[in-house]
Each structure stands twice: as C-alpha cells, then as structure tokens.
Amino acid sequence: MEREAQVKVNRRRFLASATAAAALGSTVKGAASNRTIYVVPNFHPASCGWLTTFSKERVFCANSYLNHLDRVRDDPSYAFVLSEVNNMIAIMNFRPERVPELKQRIQEGRVELVNAFFLESTINLSGGEALARLGAEGLRWQQKVFGVRPRFAWTIDVCGTHDQMAQITSGLGLEAMVYTRKNPTGKALHWALSPDGSRTLAISPGHYSELSPVFKTKEPLTPKELDEVAKFLDEKQKITPEGAPVLVLGGNDDYALAPAYQNYPREFIAKWKERDPATEIRFSTLSKYLDAVLPALKSGAVKIPTMPGGTAYDFDAFWIESPRMKSWFRRNEHALQSAEMLSTVASLKAGFDYPADALYRAWVQMFLSMDRNSLWGSAGGMVFEDAKSWDVRDRLTWIEKESNKTLAGAGSAVLASGDAIGVFNSANWKRSDPFVIQAQVAPEGSQSQTLADGSVLCEMELQPASVGAWKVVQPPKEASVPLPEVIETDHYWARVSPQTGALVSLKLKPGGREILAAPANVLVAEKPKSQSGDPGDFILGRPQRDKLASSLDYPAQISVTTGPLATTVIVEGKFLGGKTSRRLMRFYQHNPRIDFETEVEDLPNLTVLVAEFPLAASVDEVRRGIPFGFSHGAWAKPNPELHGWTTGIVPAVRWSHYALAGGGGVALFDRGLTGREINGNTPIIYLYNATDKYYGHPNSWLSGAGKHRFHYALMAHGGEWATARVPHAAWEYNCPPVILQGRVAAPPKSFLQTSPNVIVEALHRDGNEIELRLAECMGSRGDAEVVLDLPHKGAWLTDLTGGRRKPLTGGPRYHFPVNPQQIVTLRFGAGSAVSVPEPIRQWDELVPSGKLPALHEYSDQKGHPRDAA
C-alpha cells in the first residue's frame, strides 16, 4: 500500500511540475520584468525549549502553528510550512479536534509538512547514524501518522553545513536541503556536492524569517513601506539564478506568526498587483516553489553553481560550550548503538527477545536531545534541569539506563551466568587499544594493571565485532616512581616538565623526530577582547582574546605511577583565581595514544579554557570528523582541490588531524569536546566556555562554577595518513569494549567482519530484516567487504530508509565498490520478524510521573516565549 501511495504522489508531482514548467518557460521567454515571488511562511522555534521549559515551549509551538492554520482558513491566498514531529504531537495532544482540519489543508496543498527529519537538529555535533535515524524515523512517522512523505531536509537554523549533508539528503530520498547561513555561492539555488559524488539541490535564499514588514504590521503598509518591500525584492532578485522565480522564507523573526494584520496577505497581494502588475507574489508552500523551478534546473534552462564540500561556521560558542551535554550525548550515542548490535546478535543466536519498542523510545529521546539548543547547550537552565518539567537530564538518564539494561540483558542471553568476565567489542575490526574495567579483576591472558582508584587498566586483542568471556585474574598494582627524565614506549620518547607538568617533548620512534615546538597540553584561560551578543551564542576566535592565565604560570606537584601497561603522570597545582587544577597524562607502553584527563574548578564568568599543542612542523592539511566521515581542507599549503573549511572555531566529531610538512601528523581525540581551532602551527581543543547566564537565565550546564572534568587524547604518527587509521583510533577512544560481569568463560565469537576501509555505525533489526550501515572512512575509492555471521537469507544494498534496493550475491561474504566517504546501507532477510514499533504520539510513558502535570498544562500562549507576560 505504501508503494502504491508513493506512485500516486509522484504522478501528482509530475503533473504539477509539468504545469509549472510551462509557466516558467513562458516567464523565461517573456519580458525580463515579469517575475514571480514565492513567499513561504514558516514558524521557527526551539521546539524542545530555549528560554522556557519543554512543557511550556510545546504550548507556544502548537498554538503558533494553529495561528497559521487559522489564517489558511480565513484567507484563501495564505499557505505555510510545518516542521518537526514533536510540534505535530503537541497539536495532537492539546487540540486533537484541529487534526482533521490540518490533514485536510495538507491534502489541499496549503499546508506542507516540509521537514523529513524528526526535528530540526544541529547537524554538526552528532555521529552519522543518529542523523540518518533522525531522517528515517521522521519520514516513517509522518508517512504513518499523516500519510505524506516530506521532500526536504529543512535545516534553516544550522550554523554551518558539513560536507556529508548532500549525501545524507539524497540518501533519504529527498529532493533538496534548505539552509540559510554561510552560503558561499552567492546564489539562492545551487548544487551541494559530497565527497562520494552525491549531489542534491541546496536552497539558501537568505534568512529564514524575511519580508517582516508584511508580517509585523497591524495595518496596511503605506506607499513608503511598500517601496522598502520593493527594494527588498529587488535585492532578492540579485541572488536568484537567471530564469528562476524568487524565493522568500517569510516571517517576523523567530517564533513568527501569521501576519498581524488580519486582512494580510490577501490585501497585500491585491495592492501589489495594482502597484506592479509584472510581479506576482504568491504565499506558498515550498513544494510549489520546487515544482516551479525543478524542471528548468534539470533541463539546464536555469543554470546554478556547485558547492563542493561544506560551508563556514558561525555562532561559534555553540561548538565550545556545555561539555556536560555534549559528552553525555556522545556516551549515549555509542552505548545505544552497541546495545542495538548486541541485541541483534542475541536475538538471532540465543533467542533473546529483541526490545524493539524500548530501543525506538531511546532513539526518540536521542532525537529530542539533538534539538539545536539542547545539544548546543545554548538555552536557559530550565531546559536542562527543571523540578516540574520533563528536561534534558531526564531524557539522557533514560537513554543511558535503557542502553545499559539492554546490553546486560543481551549479554546474559549470549553468555551464561558464571564467575568469568565477558567482553563485547562492537567495532568491526581487530583491536587491542587500552580500556578501563570498573572492577578489581581482569580477563585472563590480558595485559593489565590496577590503577590508583582501584579500577583496572586492560589491554587485549579482541576479534572484530565479537563477544566472549574469560576467567578472571588479579592484576598487579602500579607502583609509585619519581618522574622519569624520559618516558619511553614502543612508539615515542616523551618528556614532562618537572616544574610545570607540561608535555615538553614528544619524539617519534624510530627516527627521533620532534613533534612539539613548545610545551603542550598547556591550559590557557582567555577572555574575548570585546563581546557582541550573548556569550552563549557568540565568541571571538583566539586571536581576538586576551590571555588571563596559563598552567605554565603555576608551580606543579607531580606524582607518577607505572605498571606493565602504562605510566601515569598526575600534575596538581593552582590555576586561575587561586583555584586548583589537576592534569592526568597516561602514556601507554604499546599504544601510540596519550590520554589526558583534566580537572578545573570555579572558572570565572566569561572565561574560555583551552588546551594547546604547538607543533614543530608546518601544518599542510587539516581533517576533522563530521557525521559519517571527515572534512579535509588545506592550511599552510594552498590546495584548491581540498574543499573542507579550516578557518576559525569549527565543530569536530570525535577527532581532528593535522598533517605535517615532511610527512606524519598529529590527531586530537575527544569524548564530547567538539570545538577546535588552529592558528599558525598550534591546534587547540576547547575545554570550556563559562557563561553563568544565557539571555538572563541561569544555567548550571554553562556556568564555570564547580568542578569540571575533560577527557581528550593525542596520537602522533610518522608515515602516511592512511596507515595511521585515525578514524578507527578515534572510534576506539569513544567506544571502549562493553564489560559483562558474571559470565561463563567462552571463546570469543565474531559475528561480523569487514574490509579495513569501512566503519560500521549500526547493526539492528527492523521487522523481518537486519539493517547494517557503514561508511568508507579513509577518503579513497575502493572495494568493501562484509562478512555477516548471523542467520540470514538474501542481501540488498539500499538507501538510508531501506528503499531503492539492489540485490547482493555471494553471502555470507559480500563485496561492493565504495566511493570516498560513501555511506552504505545493507539489508538482510532475517528469517524471523520482530515487532515494528508504533510511532509515538504522546510523551507520557517517558516522562517521570511527577512531571506529567506540567506536560499536560495548556494555555492560549503563542508567539515568542520571551514576549510572554
């Protein structure tokens, strides 16, 4: 039935496009002064809370959209677009009697569900799988509940667009992505191109809330005001490709309502027709604009530029603040994906009841956690913690507990109860990186040592995507020793200053090449030379900040412990404002990674804290992790073939890498410290942006008060980028093996193997199928291999939603070509089915009982919460 419905929709779109093409053709051939202006009214909130709680925000959102729906009812010339599933749920919960009317207007084409994604997320801070699920589940929800399939990636409030968005958009079967900031092409329409060659139409006509005089006036516009509108439209014409109609995303600032003057837009359109008969203004949905322009784009009658890669970034504070939020989200992301994977194995191999409903609800709360202001950290404190309203902490806690519960349950099904220790490796490659066990025992056969806090540091070879259990042994305790003059490992010689505790030298083996130009892992507290706008939104780059203090300014007390696996250096001392700091550095004997754990306390308001790593050689190229891949750009050495953005403060997912002149490079890994910047040859990782209040609202998740702990790491290497396997090492740092206590000893079994050029981000069940998603991770064209040792029959290459299938032969070993950074989704017939969760329609079952009254509280408030009494 869904496929038949899709065919009918496509036919209607074809007829609409054909009619629009004919109209557009006559416009192109006619007088140059003839033009059509499409105004697309929209409402832009922060739907999970910005300056008020989640519970109150959804009231404003529901009523504001209903305000637009009222104007559709009252004015036949009005239309608008509606975005975000949680806003639709709010309408369904508070005003269910309006839902049939909404569905009717959607069928009439006067309201459009414009956004395929579940909500308008920040696209730059999550992993790839979370972004893919956000789109796939958003599509599924809207198809199931409203019977329509949105056509767009509606990302109007993202503050920079990464290189993989074209591929994600096309992979979801969408026709265009819409963004409004940092358009580098100068044209409202252009092609966006991803590294794998995927292309999608990019629509970027300006701000998301323009033509404000029409929306904010409470009486008809005067002739002088209409003159200003004419000037505005003329400016829009300049960025519109020749032959294309003009697009305006209409509204009056954030939280825009329908025009305040009740007789607009009807009277405005009529008046404009008298004033300028050659310009037709239509208040429209976005699909009607696309139907008008798409045929001419496809035929080449309208020519547009191409944007390879991504854009620049702004609202730079978003990338460097609230590490508590970003780190917790990152942990949950990896834990949930691991829980799905182990549940899939346990259900197909050991009769485990696959928890489809619980996993779906965990993903839904991940989506809400991806709401822009939540994951940015830029909101009032009530969004993150509130005594009465469902908040970010509630959702993150729910995901964490459910993921751990699922891992334990699936582990118990795969490994029987006993006195051994189980280890689950979700990574699709053989690994031997160090990890910590929160117990006083280690698996037999591993290298291990007991740390000072009683936990155990462990290193052992783990098979790809495997689970096994080992008898336990008591590891030796590490011993206290004086600070060595040189810390020697298999990979480097390192020196730590006995005065400051800085890492002052790092020489690679075998040749002794010095990596550092000056002391590294130095903490620097800084303050902007000036401040424009709220510091939770805007922060100046490092050249425009003054230094307040450095860890080099304070004497250090240093203690050292060592064991068979690692040497740990702990540096304690004073820091800014007479407060304390603690820096832990762990040097592994057999692994090139150096781990850092840094603690500070009570950072003064408006303080930026960074850790700097001055490099001895010139940095030629910069790579940084983005969803499903990496951005790759030139630095000191110009290269027009590299399109990645490298200037200023930029977001990174898990890692950044700096390729050095003469070969080799340095990678910085993080567990939710997403901000990076490089000036000259000195990369920095942002640790904190202390902001006590956000737009006047206290927020303990932004404030510098209290203690703060940061986890990050460095890995230096000689040789080529490809041999360093930086994306793999970053994944290992973020996704350590899962420990399953109290199991029966059993040899490890691998259920998935792949070629080394891909990283698997997801393995889960969907109805009667298994879905596996991976991405080429080295940036090179080649061949990929997948070997799936789970019961299955039949395999297909699909898009991100399971559609557009191409059969694969040769199971259980499958081969297929991959382009650079290509996202690949495979589906396998499972032989049995699990339940397909019903789309969520209310939040009650997820909300703590004490917070249900606030969730259900309704009022007539609409517009901007800032303006509420």
Question: What annotation goes with each model-predicted range?
Answer:
Residues 39, 44, 48-50, 200, ...:
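Catalytic grooves of carbohydrate-active enzymes
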Residues 165-170, 204, 216-225, 231-233, ...:
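C-terminal (or distal) subdomains of carbohydrate-active enzymes
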Residues 4, 26-36:
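C-terminal segment of N-terminal export signals and the immediately downstream linker at the start
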Residues 67, 94-103, 184-195, 223-236:
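Alpha-helical scaffolding within the catalytic cores
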Residues 100-113, 170-185, 195-198:
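Acidic, His- and aromatic-enriched active-site or binding-groove loops in soluble protein domains
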Residues 2-21:
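N-terminal secretory signal peptides and thylakoid transit peptides that target proteins
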Residues 32-133, 141-144:
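N-terminal catalytic cores of secreted or lumenal carbohydrate-active enzymes
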Residues 131-164, 168-171, 230-250:
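CE4/NodB-like, metal-dependent polysaccharide N-deacetylase domain
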